[in-house]
């Protein structure tokens, strides 16, 4: 009798796991990070020419999905800056922490990071902190514009069977700690 109940429970759990794959597709932090690696070396000129401007190159982007704040993605990364200001030319490095709202675009089959904003930035050398505070609004706008146009992740029809189904049947996204779930049903 116990063997029968165990076998029945095993079959039911196997069916539930199998059915779960038919009702949703999950994208992990690791997959998002691999996709974000394509955004490494994002470069942009920002600031007020002649007053304070910088050429910025973004590297080492990594994500944390839904861990710090529900329904948000937190990105960390480095930025190399070549800055020109009234004080002359300087080089600096920054550690950035960004937050964004993941949004699914069904037409493109892509996840975009909207409402991108710098929530923390530390600069080395520290004496550049004041100049960086001047440039921060420009950096925020440049990153927001870039990530509004460039998807963080694109579903591929030639990918796995689940990914192809997600591209065709997606009904939006759900942000869970460590993953983004794309349900196929409402």
From Swiss-Prot:
Its main location: membrane. A lipid is attached at residue 19 (S-diacylglycerol cysteine). It is found in: Cell membrane. One of its GO terms (cellular component) is plasma membrane. Residues 1-18 form the signal peptide. It is a lipid-anchor. The gene is yceB. A lipid is attached at residue 19 (N-palmitoyl cysteine). This is Uncharacterized lipoprotein YceB. Keywords: Cell membrane, Lipoprotein, Membrane, Palmitate, Signal. The keyword Lipoprotein applies. Pfam families: DUF1439. Gene3D superfamilies: Uncharacterised protein PF07273, DUF1439 (3.15.10.40). The keyword Nucleotidyltransferase does not apply. InterPro entries: DUF1439.
